[in-house]
Amino acid sequence: MTARRDFLLSTTALAASALAPGLAHSATFPTRTIKYICPWPAGGATDVVMRVLAESAGKILNTSVIIENKPGASGVLGGAELVNAKPDGYTLAQLPISVFRVPHMQKTTFDTLNDFTWIICLTGYTFGLVVPIDSPIKSIKELVAWAKENPNKFTYGTPGAGSSPHLAIEEFAQKAGIQLSHIPFKGGAQNLQAVLGGHTMAMSDSTSWGQLVDAGKLRLLATYGSQRTKRWSSVATLNELGYETVSDSPFGVCGPKNMDPAVVKILHDAFQKTLKDPAVIAIFAQFDQPIIEMNTAQYTKYAKETFVAERKTIERLGMLNKD
């Protein structure tokens, strides 16, 4: 009996010691700087918003949360970084909607549904199409008429091929029966510089153009949400104009697969609290971004459903990779 009791005690001790490193890690997390990857260039709307979120989360977690920019490839480089990162909670990323689309268009180094932990969704974008204030095109109706007379001559920039600003305009163009010329850039900053410099006729992007619209330097032709924005309430949506195109692209915080659930909860709760930070509320208002909160289970469900839905969109637009 004594031998059996000693055996049970020893096996229990071994099991506890095996769990101890993980328990100890979650109990003390975080103990060093957390990297939060922004898959867009510094200076763009997403970069600015993420820096405010990072600063707010850092105060809550009592550590530094730094932004590391990995621009290019339509915003999927954050996902590529997470695949090779340790699942310890110290490497996080923003995974834009392009991670649900690009794998249907070309080969990627990650599996969208199996390589990531969807920690929390925080917000989404307001997208819009803008032209220089001196452009002869003053409305979507005029754009459609001009494009029908000049096929493939109307140039518009986006932050990357397969991004929401790209596919929303492609879907609009398909439904309007027009052909436009797409110019992809490595993020919003380059996209904005191109339209201001006269290198493109229009810019399709999130609201990095907002202050210039308010200042009278750019004209907002339409937004892509399910309803009009509060900030530009006089501007109709593409959906409202009859083109059945809606895009808001929720995003938040993601990590590598196989993360410790306790660490996931710590990160989830910290970033959830940022949504009540006046600085975060103010930056969302500046870029007219709504709060779109989803917990880990909801965000994971959203990822699965969106991956399937985006395949249908890519196929409908004739962009599906059949290799």
How would you name each of these model-derived features?
Residues 25-115, 153, 161, 178-204, ...:
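N-terminal (or domain-start) structured segment
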Residues 1-14:
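N-terminal secretory signal peptides and thylakoid transit peptides that target proteins
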Residues 84-90, 104-190, 238, 248-283:
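Hinge/capping helix and adjacent helix->loop/strand transition within the periplasmic-binding protein
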Residues 124, 209-276, 305-308, 322:
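C-terminal lobe and pocket-closing loops
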Residues 43, 97, 132-137, 158-163, ...:
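Short coil/turn segments
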Residues 31-33, 174-178, 259-323:
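An extracytoplasmic/periplasmic, membrane-proximal ligand-sensing/linker region
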